[in-house]
Regions:
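S-adenosyl-L-methionine
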Residues: 1-59, 70-72, 76, 99-122
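Class I SAM-dependent methyltransferase "Motif I" SAM/SAH-binding loop
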Residues: 64-68
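Short beta-strand element of Class I
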Residues: 81-84
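A short SAM/SAH-binding and catalytic strip from SAM-dependent methyltransferases
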Residues: 127-141
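Conserved SAM-binding loop
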Residues: 96
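Conserved SAM/SAH-binding beta-strand->alpha-helix loop
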Residues: 89
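Conserved beta-strand/loop positions that form the S-adenosyl-L-methionine
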Residues: 63, 86
Length: 141
């Protein structure tokens, strides 16, 4: 199958020379970026959608779901789980899909870093976590 994606290339030939020091620095200092209210509201809305469907349902997170095809497929694959598709782009999430949204699926616009932190803060454990479309140049913020 041919695609039109650009080839990913980098001048970096191996791990960064200071990788260990950078990791230790981040481990030694807490992440201080505040979680914005809209992310807290998005997190609450996602859990409320799960609770409305089945309060005890295991959770599947489709991180960076884009237009949501993977969220729909995951909901089909795990009919007894509640699948939350999260993406930062409301444009991508809102793009039309020929399939209807299953009852065990929910799309949410939110910042993924905040969403992950909110799962941890709330003590919520995921049954499955998918990152199917990784950005080769992730950015926080």
């Amino acid at each position: 199958m041919a695609g039109n994606s650009r080839f990913i290339s980098s001048a970096q030939s191996g791990p960064h020379d200071d990788l260990a020091a950078l990791v230790h620095r981040h481990l030694d200092h807490p992440f201080r970026k505040p979680i914005l209210d809209y992310n807290r509201q998005a997190f609450s809305a996602a859990l409320a959608a799960r609770d409305a469907w089945n309060p005890g349902a295991p959770l599947v997170l489709d991180a960076g779901c884009g237009v949501g095809w993977s969220t729909l497929r995951l909901a089909e694959r795990y009919p007894d789980h509640f699948v939350i598709g999260v993406d930062q782009s409301s444009d991508r999430i809102s793009r039309g899909k020929p399939l209807s949204l299953p009852a065990n699926a929910h799309f949410q616009r939110a910042d993924l870093v905040a969403f992950w932190r909110l799962f941890d803060e709330a003590g919520v454990r995921l049954a499955r976590h998918y990152v199917l479309y990784p950005n080769p140049w992730p950015k926080i913020g």
